C-alpha cells in the first residue's frame, strides 16, 4: 500500500472524508465472535475502513441480506478445471470464491518453469485473488517420467513474488524421511523465506506425521478419516477437508471438527472438473454440505473463509472488519448458502466481465506437447501364465486411494479383458519425449462394457493413460489424443465417439469457459454409450490411477507400482 492510499483510507475511517462505497441495511457476520451486527460497512480503495454509520459516494442497499466474508479455496489445481485462470475465475466467483491458493504442479510437470510462469501471468488477468504455492515434487517420485524436473534452484527465485505463499504439497515422503539433499533444500528455502509448506500425507502413519512436522510441513489435504484428522491437529497441523470431482472426503472427516479445534480446519477442492464447478459450485458447496451434516453454520462459514486466511498468513482476508479487504458475499439464505452478489476488492462481480486471457497466444510455447511413438496393438499385450492369478487395481469410487487384489484371468497366453468380472486393461504411455515406454495393468471398477477412454491428464507426470475393453479401441483413443494435442477422448468400435481438446500442455483448453463446459457435457453424455453407469467421474478417477504417492497400487510407464512398498511389481506374482 502506498502512502496516498494509506492516507485516503484513514480519512474515510475517521469520517474526515466520505468513503468510496458504503453498504447499508445488511446483517454482517462477525466471524470472530460468531454473531450478527446490523451496521454500515465503509469501503475505500478496495478495503473495509470501518463499521458503523458512514457516508459514501456510492451506496449499496443490502436489503436485509447477510454479508459474509468471501470464500477461500485452500488448495486447488486450477489445471483440473481444464481452462486458464481467467476462465476458471468466471466459474468460481459466482459461487462466492474470492480467493484461491493454487499449486500449478500439473502444468509444471509438463512444461517446468515455463508452465509456472504462464500460470502466474494468467493469474494477473483476473479479479480473482490467486495465490501460489510452488510445486515441490516435479516429478512426484524420482522414477517418474514427467516432462520436466524442478529442483530447489529453479524454485528459489519465485519466493520473492508477493503472490507466492510457500512450497506446495510435499508428496515424496521417502525423500523427506531420507533427508534427500534437494528436498531438504526446498524445505529450507521455503522456511528461510518465511513461507508456508503444504503436506501430502496420504495413508501415512503417525510416525510419518512426526517427520513431516519436523520438516516444517503445516497442512494436509489427504485426510480421509476423523482419526487421521485429529492425529494431525494434535501435532499442530491444519487439516483441509476436500471435496473434488474424484475425492470426496468432507462427510467422512467432518466428525473430527468441534468448537475447540475448528480453527485448525478449512475447505479445499483440490481437483474439480469445470462442469462440476459450474453446476455444483466450489467452497460454497462444502459450506452447505457441512451445515447439512450438522455443523454449526457460523463454524462452517468460518472454515470457508477466516481459517484458511490465518493458515496462509493472508492478514487482510477472511473477515468483515476494518483492515480487511472488501471481499464480501451477499447471502439471502444463510444455511442454504444462497449467494446473490459477490464483491471482490470493493467491486461487485457483474457476471458480464470479459476474460483478459490471451489463451493460445500466450501459451504458444506450451502447445504441441504430446509426442507419441508408433504404437501397435501388440504393444498392448500383457503376457500371462494361465494357471496363475493376476494383480488387479481395485478403484474406490470417489476416493483417490485404491486397493490391490488378485483375480483369475481368462485362458490364453495374454490377458483378455473380462467384462463379466469387470476386469479391464489399463495403459500408461509416455507422451513427453516420444519414446516407447508403456506400462500395462489390469483394473476393476470402471464398469465399461464397450470401448475405451483416455486422457493426457494423468497425475502427476501427465503421461497418457487409457482404460478399455479391447486393444483396438484403446489404441484408437491413444492415437486420437496425439492428433488433437491432448485432452480427453472416448473410442468405440475403432472410432472416436467424443473428445475434448486440451492443446495447452495437454491439460488446458484455449477456449472460453462456456465452450469447454458444453464440450464436457457432451463427453459425459457420450460415455454412456460404453455402458458406463457409475456414480463417479470416470475421467478424473482414471487420471489419478497414475499417481504413485497415494496408496495402495497405481500405474506408471513402467507398470504396476506398489505405493507402500515403493517399488514396481509385475502383473502376475
From Swiss-Prot:
Gene3D superfamilies per UniProt: Metal-dependent hydrolases (3.20.20.140), Urease, subunit C, domain 1 (2.30.40.10)
SUPFAM superfamilies, A to Z: Composite domain of metallo-dependent hydrolases, Metallo-dependent hydrolases
Segments traversing the membrane: none
Domain of life: Bacteria
Keywords: Hydrolase, Manganese
Gene Ontology biological process: adenine catabolic process
GO MF annotation, one: adenine deaminase activity
Known EC number: 3.5.4.2
Catalytic activity: adenine + H2O + H(+) = hypoxanthine + NH4(+)
Cofactor: Mn(2+)
Family: Belongs to the metallo-dependent hydrolases superfamily. Adenine deaminase family.
Protein's recorded name: Adenine deaminase
Organism: Bacillus licheniformis (strain ATCC 14580 / DSM 13 / JCM 2505 / CCUG 7422 / NBRC 12200 / NCIMB 9375 / NCTC 10341 / NRRL NRS-1264 / Gibson 46)
Gene: ade
Amino acid at each position: 500500500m502506498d502512502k496516498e492510499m494509506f492516507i485516503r483510507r484513514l480519512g474515510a475511517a475517521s469520517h474526515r472524508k466520505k468513503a468510496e462505497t458504503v453498504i447499508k441495511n445488511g446483517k454482517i457476520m462477525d466471524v470472530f465472535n460468531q454473531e450478527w451486527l446490523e451496521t454500515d460497512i465503509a469501503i475505500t480503495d478496495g478495503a473495509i475502513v470501518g463499521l458503523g454509520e458512514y457516508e459514501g459516494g456510492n451506496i449499496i442497499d443490502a436489503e436485509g441480506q447477510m454479508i459474509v466474508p468471501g470464500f477461500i479455496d485452500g488448495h486447488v489445481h486450477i489445471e483440473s478445471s481444464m481452462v486458464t485462470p481467467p476462465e476458471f475465475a468466471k466459474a468460481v466467483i459466482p459461487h462466492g470464491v474470492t480467493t484461491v491458493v493454487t499449486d500449478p504442479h500439473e502444468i509444471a510437470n509438463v512444461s517446468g518453469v515455463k508452465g509456472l510462469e504462464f500460470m502466474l501471468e494468467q493469474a494477473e488477468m483476473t479479479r480473482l485473488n490467486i495465490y501460489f504455492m510452488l510445486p515441490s515434487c516435479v516429478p512426484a517420485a524420482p522414477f517418474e517420467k514427467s516432462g520436466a524436473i524442478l529442483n530447489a534452484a529453479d524454485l528459489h527465485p519465485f519466493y520473492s513474488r508477493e503472490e507466492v505463499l510457500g512450497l506446495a504439497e510435499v508428496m515424496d515422503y521417502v525423500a523427506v524421511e531420507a533427508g534427500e539433499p534437494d528436498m531438504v533444500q526446498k524445505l529450507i528455502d521455503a522456511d528461510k523465506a518465511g513461507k508456508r509448506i503444504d503436506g501430502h500425507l496420504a495413508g501415512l502413519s503417525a510416525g510419518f506425521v512426526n517427520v513431516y512436522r519436523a520438516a516444517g510441513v503445516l497442512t494436509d489435504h489427504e485426510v480421509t478419516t476423523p482419526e487421521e484428522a485429529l492425529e494431525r491437529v494434535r501435532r499442530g497441523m491444519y487439516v483441509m477437508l476436500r471435496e473434488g470431482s474424484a475425492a470426496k472426503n468432507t462427510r467422512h472427516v467432518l466428525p473430527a471438527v468441534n468448537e475447540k479445534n475448528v480453527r485448525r480446519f478449512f475447505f479445499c477442492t483440490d481437483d474439480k472438473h469445470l462442469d462440476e464447478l459450474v453446476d455444483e459450485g466450489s467452497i460454497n458447496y462444502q459450506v452447505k454440505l457441512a451445515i447439512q451434516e450438522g455443523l454449526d453454520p457460523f463454524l462452517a462459514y468460518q472454515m470457508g473463509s477466516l481459517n484458511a486466511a490465518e493458515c496462509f498468513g493472508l492478514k487482510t482476508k477472511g473477515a468483515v472488519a476494518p483492515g480487511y479487504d472488501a471481499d464480501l458475499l451477499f447471502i439471502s439464505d444463510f444455511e442454504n448458502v444462497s449467494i446473490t452478489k459477490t464483491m471482490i476488492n470493493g467491486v461487485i462481480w457483474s457476471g458480464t466481465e470479459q476474460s483478459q486471457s490471451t489463451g493460445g497466444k500466450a501459451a504458444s510455447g506450451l502447445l504441441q506437447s504430446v509426442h507419441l511413438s508408433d504404437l501397435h496393438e501388440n504393444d498392448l499385450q500383457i503376457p500371462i501364465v494361465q494357471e496363475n492369478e493376476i494383480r488387479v487395481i481395485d478403484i474406490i469410487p470417489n476416493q483417490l486411494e485404491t486397493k490391490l487384489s488378485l483375480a483369475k484371468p481368462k485362458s490364453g497366453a495374454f490377458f483378455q479383458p473380462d467384462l463379466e468380472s469387470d476386469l479391464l486393461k489399463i495403459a500408461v504411455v509416455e507422451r513427453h519425449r516420444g519414446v516407447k515406454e508403456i506400462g500395462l495393468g489390469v483394473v476393476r471398477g470402471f464398469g465399461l462394457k464397450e470401448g475405451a477412454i483416455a486422457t493426457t491428464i494423468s497425475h502427476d507426470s501427465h503421461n497418457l493413460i487409457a482404460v478399455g475393453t479391447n486393444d483396438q479401441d484403446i489404441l484408437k483413443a491413444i492415437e486420437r489424443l496425439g492428433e488433437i494435442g491432448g485432452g480427453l477422448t472416448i473410442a468405440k468400435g475403432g472410432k472416436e465417439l467424443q473428445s475434448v481438446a486440451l492443446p495447452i500442455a495437454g491439460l488446458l483448453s484455449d477456449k472460453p469457459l462456456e465452450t469447454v463446459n458444453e464440450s464436457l457435457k457432451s463427453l459425459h453424455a457420450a460415455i454412456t454409450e460404453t455402458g458406463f453407469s457409475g456414480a463417479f467421474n470416470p475421467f478424473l478417477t482414471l487420471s489419478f490411477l497414475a499417481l504413485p504417492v497415494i496408496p495402495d497400487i497405481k500405474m506408471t510407464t513402467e507398470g504396476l507400482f506398489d505405493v507402500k512398498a515403493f517399488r514396481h511389481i509385475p502383473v502376475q506374482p
